């Protein structure tokens, strides 16, 4: 990779985008053609009264906040490679490899925790996920994860990533714990998604501002302080 020309890197990036788009498009066709859903013609779809009712529901608001605070952890995955290169002094290839490897935790954590949640309950496991994410965030926020302590860096990254993916694998499953009627689950998911995915709007600019304004480890510490606060809110 390090010996690739700019044109070769562009071509590789183009192939990645093309392959991803093809997979998404193919998945859409498969779902459309093979997922049979029975629709009751008498049922009202998109009833505004139901939407207003759900927007006033304490359960919907709380689930939205759980997703929001959990998603703050997911947004930190964008800066793992930056931490590796700026603070741990890894080269560009090593930093990218670290960011790629942590992605393998996602299917492992999500699948494993699904079985565990069946026995322990979704809410209890989600609280545990926030607690795990909090521990990792505190390690990074403390400033002790610095160049030369590669094992501590890997351990801290695994802790944060594991907590993040535990939450990501379960947060929509708590809709039933919120006693939301199945007939309104689609509308409820839409509302909690609007609340929960707002970090897509503000988290990246916020993290970017902190990292640009406060050079070195200071900026990263501030990012993980925010993540620690988000984890505490999620636990609460």
Mark where each language-model region is.
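A membrane-interface helix-boundary motif in multi-pass transporters
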Residues: 2-21, 208-231
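C-terminal membrane-cytosol helix-exit motif in multi-pass small-molecule transporters
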Residues: 21-41
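Juxtamembrane intracellular "pre-TM" segments in multi-pass secondary transporters
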Residues: 36-63
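Extracytoplasmic gate region of multi-pass secondary transporters
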Residues: 59-110, 203-204
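Transmembrane alpha-helical segments of major facilitator superfamily
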Residues: 98-106, 192, 196, 230
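Helix-to-loop junctions at the C-terminal end of transmembrane segments
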Residues: 109-122, 211-212
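C-terminal transmembrane helical hairpin of 12-TM major facilitator-type secondary transporters
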Residues: 121-174
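A late C-terminal transmembrane helix in Major Facilitator Superfamily
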Residues: 179-215
């Amino acid at each position: 990779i390090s010996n690739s020309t700019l044109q070769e890197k562009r071509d590789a990036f183009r192939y990645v985008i093309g392959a991803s788009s093809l997979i998404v498009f193919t998945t859409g066709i498969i779902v459309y053609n093979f997922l049979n859903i029975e629709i009751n013609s008498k049922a009202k779809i998109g009833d505004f009264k139901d939407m207003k009712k759900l927007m006033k529901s304490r359960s919907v608001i709380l689930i939205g906040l759980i997703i929001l605070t959990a998603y703050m952890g997911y947004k930190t995955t964008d800066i793992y490679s930056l931490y590796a290169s700026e603070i741990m002094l890894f080269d560009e290839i090593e930093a990218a490899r670290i960011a790629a490897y942590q992605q393998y935790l996602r299917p492992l954590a999500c699948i494993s925790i699904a079985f565990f949640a069946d026995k322990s309950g979704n809410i209890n496991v989600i609280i545990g996920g926030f607690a795990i994410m909090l521990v990792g965030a505190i390690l990074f926020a403390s400033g002790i994860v610095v160049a030369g302590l590669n094992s501590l860096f890997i351990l801290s990254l695994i802790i944060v990533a594991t907590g993040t993916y535990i939450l990501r694998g379960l947060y929509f499953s708590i809709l039933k714990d919120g006693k939301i009627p199945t007939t309104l689950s689609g509308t409820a998911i839409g509302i909690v998604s609007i609340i929960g995915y707002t970090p897509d709007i503000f988290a990246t600019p916020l993290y970017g501002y902190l990292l640009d304004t406060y050079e070195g480890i200071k900026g990263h510490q501030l990012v993980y302080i925010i993540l620690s606060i988000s984890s505490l809110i999620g636990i609460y």
